[in-house]
From Swiss-Prot:
GO cellular component, one term: cytoplasm
Domain of life: Bacteria
Protein name (record): Phosphoserine aminotransferase
Primary location group: cytoplasm
Organism: Stenotrophomonas maltophilia (strain R551-3)
Gene3D superfamilies hit by this protein: Aspartate Aminotransferase, domain 1, Type I PLP-dependent aspartate aminotransferase-like (Major domain)
Location(s) in or outside the cell: Cytoplasm
Amino acid sequence: MTRAFNFSAGPATLPESVLRQAQAEMLDWHGSGASIVEMSHRGAEFMSVAAEAEADLRRLLDIPEDYAVLFLSGGATTQQALIPLNFAAPGQRADYVVSGHWGKTAVKQAGVYVDVNIAASSEANGYRELPARADWQLSPDAAYVHLTANETIHGVEFRDVPDTGNVPLIADFSSSIASEPLDVRRYGVIYAGAQKNLGPVGIAVMIIRLDLLERSGQPRADIFDYRSHVARDSMLNTPPTWNWYLAGLVFKWMLAEGGVAEFAKRNAAKAALVYGAIDGSGGFYRNEVAHAARSRMNIPFFLPDAELDARFVAEAKAAGLLALKGHKVVGGIRASLYNAMPLAGAEALVAFMADFQQRHG
């Protein structure tokens, strides 16, 4: 069987070796006579899987001991609602930097619980660049500052960590976590849905500085309280064990491949290929994002008209290049180049782009 190159923004492509290992272990995990999906989350077998996954993630991202790591059901949008509940008092101000669709979603979720101050936004220019740091209007008494590290739809990415002083910085890293070295200590909280760089859909990773858990936050049930999840090692309720197991396999794969430093090199090479093809097309393909803000993970681009966009997607699919249709918010084309996308995938896309332009340009 020949696998296609899957450029989906999420759920995204997974390493073939991980999928094959999961396939081989599906019926009989490590000689136990049972599948991992059948095992109790509190049994010794799965507890070992969970402990290894946390240890491997800590090693992969160099997470300090004074940060808790959680594996929780759901995705990043759920955490966007839980973050103000846990880290801000009722009605307290929280600063939000909006650089795209998901930053705007975070504002909507938080607005139910806190006084949201949109400290900066690039919406006026269509999210084609990052909000200029000099224009940020931060609140000295804010509970936290929130930003989205990489916007999958608009294709913009923060590469430098902004200094927020004594106010904790909270960041949604769903689409760029583990794609390059990350200084965890610059953040109060890092959160990410797993389905782009860390594993399958259905599980989220939280990295929380322990002192922030001392905040009383707002009245909430235990299931919405990060302190309760930390106290129970992410097993306050039955976790998505299969997703956790698969994420653990992805962590091991990344470590074996050389860790985040190696993936930073690979991701830079893939992005350079695709942006090079766009910029060298004489305008047939165009990316509208300011060069300094361009995402390495998600590259949106457009052809001269919508009819050509649709033809590009259809012909690419026939050529074994999947899920290149842009998000409905912006249209066009989008190529997602997460860690599990090999260089050969970017090369195949660039070759197809050249051929398509020759035939339709």
